[in-house]
Amino acid sequence: MLPLQVQAESHVPLYVQIRDQLRAMVHTGELRPGDRIPASRELAHSLGVHRTTVANAYAELESEGLIQGHVGRGTFIRNAAEAALPHGTNGTNGGSNGARGFTPAPPTIGNGTLRWESLFADERGEEALSRIYPEGANGAISLVAARPAEEHFPLEELRSCVQAVLKTSGGEILQLGSSDGYEPLKRELIAQLGKEGLRVKSEQLLVTAGVQQSLDLLCKAFLRPGDAVVLEDPTYPGSMTVFTTARVRCLGVPVRTGTNGQAGPAGIDLEGVEAALTQNRVKFVLVTPDWQNPTGATMPVESRRRLLELAARHQVAVVEDCIYSRLRFTGQRLPSLRQLDRNNIVIQIDSFSKIAFPGLRVGWCIAPENVIERLRLVKQATDLHTDQLAQATLAEFTRRGGLDRHLKKMRRVYAERAEALMKALAKHMPEGTEWTRPEGGMCVWVTLPAGYDASELLIHAREKGVLFAPGRYFYVQAPKPNVFRLGFASLDEKRIARGVEILGNVLREEMRKRERGGWRRSDSRVALV
């Protein structure tokens, strides 16, 4: 393993410390052309940092031409001649064999069994929570996911909508469609947005396969390896996966939750945003202003205005994830960043996944017309268009008023479940435990007393039939071991109360063990399966 060291207490970001040490080792000859450096996951484990931190360092070094990832082989130090050449050349011709600056290894002759792992691009990508903690496994009470309550899906109404679409459109709806999106759905979305105070033209709206695809399209349209984006920290793991897979540097800025005596308004730390924009060439800032995932924090209006001012001054785009915005239980809905935008710098992404049916995979993106045109071309190259039948069904469902009725009902259901969670936490969690109290969304962020490890707690909670999501999966930079997320939307009040009761009992037992000297901290980097 490389002789690298990082200092967590330093004012220098961890990824910069790693980058600078590797760069120095190249210049001093400690690392020579052709040397293989550790995979990002391997080095992160060795240094005790998040894999994204190492990925950010590697992305910068790759953009400088000092290292190069190679399909099936790993990441290597480039020689000086290769570093001076544009990516995609090998100094002799423009052929694809030299596209990554290496002479391809000859094919290995084996026993006839193909080793698929040798063909993978590399080891990028975190294991999804849904794979590590399958929903309802062994009858467990799963507080892992932030997903809708399927027992309240209006199946009969949805079935009627599908039948109406097939009767009206026949086989035409099963043909290829427009990359822009199904026009009747776009009209319904524009009408819905208009009722919420946001005026949008058809040319400013692109139908996608959900927020995850919207992020992927933005990544492909705007970002190159080594480019930087600002993310909330902690954040939605899917966004990190999109960007780290593309070798984009993720700059995490802390999110204030109002717990642990934090000063300042809730939401992303604006001083941290300003510092990131001042010290880096950032392409865009990604934020979830309403009930941020995983913390449940909501940005006040004044903070939203200030974020837009910062972005405009630094000429940086803002990507606004509104996936939870319609799930407010109480009070008035706050204006979106897009509504407050006076400089045409906001790209808004949204989806039916939290407000209706996640399995249909339909979302949308709102942006300036020239941005939408670019995204449309990228989408066309990616998947041609979003599922036509799903779009048409949702258009009919919305036209009939089904979406409004469903939302009204689900806000009430989720409010009751959130209240049940608040009461259960207050009743069963030991002193010193804190949690957020969102007025909307689907999740709550819990902070254990200092010194306790949520991953250790999960091992024992799982044995008792309760699952939750440790905070380490959500961090861009150094994970905090004593935090975790609880998703409440998909469980009824009885199971929520029972799950938290078990969780509280497990935590109290761990506290008693600690007092007796039997408590043991686990390595929070170990995947729990």
Residue ranges and their predicted role:
Residues 231, 252, 318-320, 394, ...:
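Hydrophobic residues in well-ordered beta-strands that form the structural core
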Residues 474-479:
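AMP-binding (ANL) adenylation modules
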Residues 345-427, 434-438:
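PLP-dependent aminotransferase class I/II
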Residues 161-314, 325-343, 414, 494, ...:
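Conserved core of the PLP fold type I
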